[in-house]
C-alpha cells in the first residue's frame, strides 16, 4: 500500500508495506559476528556497529564510535547486550510467565495477561523498544503476576476485588 501525502508543498509517496527491519537484523548480526560477541553479548555499555545510524553518534555526538546503542527491536537489543545466552534466559522469563498465567491460573483475567505477555514476546521481534517507561513497567508487572503463585491462585472474584482495592479504599473509623 502506497500512501500519498503533501509535505512542504510537494507530493511524497510512502510505501507502508516497505521492509524497514531486515537491514537492522543484518547490521546487528554482522556486528556480533565481526566483533565476536554472539555468545555473551557486548555489554550494556556498547551497541551494535551501524552504517545506517552510527554516523550520528560518531560525528555529531563526537563519540568516535559508529554504533547504535539501542534499536527499536527489543530482542535485538537484548542479543547485543547479553548475547545468545542472555537472549535465551530473557525469553525463558517471558515464556515461563506466559505459560503459568495461561495454563496454571484460576482466573480468566490472568489468562488474558498471559496472552498479553506472549504477544509482547512475539512483538519484540518486530518492534517493542526497551525503555524505562509506563509500557515496560506494566509489562514487567504483568510478567511478575504470571510468575506469582499468589496471583495464579486467585479466582476471578479475588482478582476483581484486588483491582477494585487499588482504586477504592474504605476509610477506617477509629
Language-model features: locations:
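Generic hydrophobic alpha-helical membrane-span motif
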Residues: 47, 89-92, 133
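Compositionally biased, low-complexity regions
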Residues: 1-6
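Long extracytoplasmic/lumenal interhelical loops at the membrane interface
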Residues: 11-82
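Eukaryotic scaffold repeat domains enriched in small/polar residues
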Residues: 172-174
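Short, flexible micro-motifs
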Residues: 44, 86-89, 147
Amino acid at each position: 500500500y502506497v500512501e500519498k501525502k503533501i509535505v512542504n508543498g510537494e507530493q511524497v509517496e510512502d510505501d507502508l508495506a516497505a521492509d524497514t527491519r531486515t537491514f537492522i537484523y543484518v547490521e546487528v548480526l554482522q556486528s556480533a559476528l565481526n566483533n565476536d560477541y554472539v555468545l555473551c553479548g557486548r555489554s550494556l555499555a556498547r551497541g551494535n556497529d551501524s552504517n545506517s545510524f552510527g554516523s550520528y553518534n560518531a560525528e555529531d555526538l563526537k563519540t568516535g564510535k559508529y554504533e547504535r546503542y539501542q534499536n527499536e527491536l527489543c530482542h535485538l537489543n537484548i542479543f547485543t547486550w547479553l548475547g545468545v545466552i542472555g537472549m535465551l534466559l530473557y525469553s525463558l522469563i517471558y515464556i515461563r510467565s506466559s505459560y503459568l498465567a495461561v495454563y496454571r491460573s484460576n482466573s480468566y483475567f490472568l489468562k488474558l495477561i498471559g496472552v498479553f505477555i506472549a504477544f509482547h514476546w512475539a512483538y519484540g521481534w518486530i518492534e517493542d523498544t526497551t525503555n524505562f517507561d509506563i509500557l515496560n513497567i506494566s509489562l514487567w508487572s504483568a510478567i511478575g503476576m504470571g510468575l506469582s503463585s499468589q496471583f495464579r491462585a486467585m479466582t476471578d472474584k479475588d482478582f476483581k476485588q484486588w483491582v477494585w482495592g487499588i482504586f477504592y479504599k474504605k476509610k477506617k473509623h477509629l
